[in-house]
Amino acid sequence: MQPPPRKVKVTQELRNIQGEQMTKLQAKHQAECDLLEDMRTFSQKKAAIEREYAQGIQKLASQYLKRDWPGIKTDDRNDYRSMYPVWKSFLEGTMQVAQSRINICENYKNFISEPARAVRSLKEQQLKRCVDQLTKIQTELQETVKDLVKGKKKYFETEQMAHAVREKADIEAKSKLSLFQSRISLQKASVKLKARRSECNTKATHARNDYLLTLAAANAHQDRYYQTDLVNIMKALDGNVYDHLKDYLIAFSRTELETCQAIQNTFQFLLENSSKVVRDYNLQLFLQENAVFHKPQPFQFQPCDSDTSRQLESETGTTEEHSLNKEARKWATRVAREHKNIVHQQRVLNELECHGVALSEQSRAELEQKIDEARESIRKAEIIKLKAEARLDLLKQIGVSVDTWLKSAMNQVMEELENERWARPPAVTSNGTLHSLNADAEREEGEEFEDNMDVFDDSSSSPSGTLRNYPLTCKVVYSYKASQPDELTIEEHEVLEVIEDGDMEDWVKARNKVGQVGYVPEKYLQFPTSNSLLSMLQSLAALDSRSHTSSNSTEAELVSGSLNGDASVCFVKALYDYEGQTDDELSFPEGAIIRILNKENQDDDGFWEGEFSGRIGVFPSVLVEELSASENGDTPWTREIQISPSPKPHTSLPPLPLYDQPPSSPYPSPDKRSSQFFPRSPSANENSLHAESPGFSQASRQTPDTSYGKLRPVRAAPPPPTQNHRRTTEKMEDVEITLV
């Protein structure tokens, strides 16, 4: 059990409560004074900072306002399409905002700092008066409580005495008469005891009444103390301090809002005017003031004194006409070749821009350098192409058949670009070099070729050739499901590469995008309209046959080496990007095809040795997955021969159309009967497996032949689905097939 609470005297308890009240009121007063002081000092320091900042801004803006900018005239100061007036307006607006901040510093001093000091001084004086008055009121209440305690004490004493007399009287009344007491003595004692009891009861009643009256008075006094006197003291102590604090807080917020409003009004106006600044108007002003940038007069022909001619001249059947035709052929070829260079460099530029963010600063710098080189190559090619087109335009004005040469050259370039789409695209190698960044070398080689091509006299040849030059890209019009092992299943809208004609009519051999080869119906395909220059090569049959013999022998060696040495070749596909940590490790992107050279090593640390993009190194085997036999190109029906160490990735570029009209020439064709042609290089053979252009190398592609065990179809091709099956069933013929 806990001991009963200790009884404290009422007067002592009252003094403790009143002392605590006095302490709390003084603490409240001190907190309010501290708040006033904080507001006062904060406003002073903020005003000083604002003033210093505003003066610094004014000094900064004034320095720039002293400069004389070009293009600012007195009558053009409100023309905000020029950047110089807007800039000057911005500086002037900054000066105005800085001046408004200085004015705000005065508001801090006038509305917060000085009034807060006066309010605090007044509050200190009010505290002293309130403390004296509260002490007096508390003393009066203490006296009242003391009287209450005295009345209570007197009441307890008289009541206890009366209680004792009453008990004694009751005892006497109940006691029996003894043998030695007389009745008279007993009566006297009883009368005396009753008189004393009556007197004690009267005193007790009087003391009780006094105590109750004093208690009522003390309670009334206490109620007034808490309800009136103490409230008045606290009200007097507070005074108007809360009104002043509210005014100061409002002044802080209003001042900031006025500052923000002034800044917003100024810079909103400047923002609207800044949006009117346009480059074209500023450039126009600059050009008006600087006549040196005006386009000069075109260069004029300055004839010799004895020369009376002012333009190109052509005489029918003369050497000059032949020379002009050769010039037209030369520059048409140059236009086509530069168009091809632009396409190549644009492809390289797109690949470089999609390369992603380089990890190191050095790699980033190298990547930016490659991008700049590609853009520079495009710029040079465009200039050369423009100059060649200007020459062709002048030749066309005198009747030279420019369009014929340009159309033939562009068709040849379009064929080459279309065939190159199936080759390995240009890519960045491990050492940062680019396979296709050789436009300058190609251009130099082309110029040397143009200088030497005058030895061929082919001005009477014709560009009207309709023979197909395989390999050729085509589009599937109707789906077809293979019914024989040597046929190929195709889907509608699929893009195929036709390799060669079939032995039977209406059949061709084609390769799909995954490398599968087989025979498909020719009428199920849509071939591009090609105006190639195959007929031009007929005049170079001797040179072509020599080049063809050399190229065939080289390809035979490559095929033999592939069959004998790469029978167990294995490829894997990268599942993630990997950056080599050392010089002997191989780096590759996600989806890369890597040729495996060795899976076993002495450490057995999970690293394989492989080749990617011409570089050999080791890499973690957990980052790749092995390709199946069909993916490796080793299906039993096709026996594809893989010469490149990695399969050609699928390019997302759309098929390039073959031009029926020159894409960049605005000239209409004058007369196609008088067309003349430009011969291809003797190294380009119409039956070659490679589609190469001067200075541009692409991956080699081998065409499967019947010598490797493929059976050519000896059956009629099915008609397209849109045609009626009007053909009758043809009799199967026995054909003797000889495997070589």
Swiss-Prot record:
Domain SH3: 469-530, 567-629
Species assigned in the record: Mus musculus
Gene name tied to this protein: Fchsd2
UniProt modification remark: Phosphorylated. Phosphorylation on a Ser residue is important for recruitment to the cell membrane and for its role in promoting endocytosis.
Membrane topology: Peripheral membrane protein
Protein name per Swiss-Prot or TrEMBL: F-BAR and double SH3 domains protein 2
MF annotations from Gene Ontology: phosphatidylinositol-3,4,5-trisphosphate binding; phosphatidylinositol-3,4-bisphosphate binding
Top-level taxon of the source organism: Eukaryota
Domain called F-BAR: residue spans: 8-282
Residue segments, region Disordered: 303-323, 629-740
Quaternary structure note: Homodimer. Interacts (via SH3 domain 2) with ITSN1 (via SH3 domain 4). Recruited to clathrin-coated pits during a mid-to-late stage of assembly via interaction with ITSN1. Interacts (via SH3 domain 1) with WASL. Interacts with WAS. Interacts with CASK and MAGI1. CASK inhibits interaction with MAGI1.
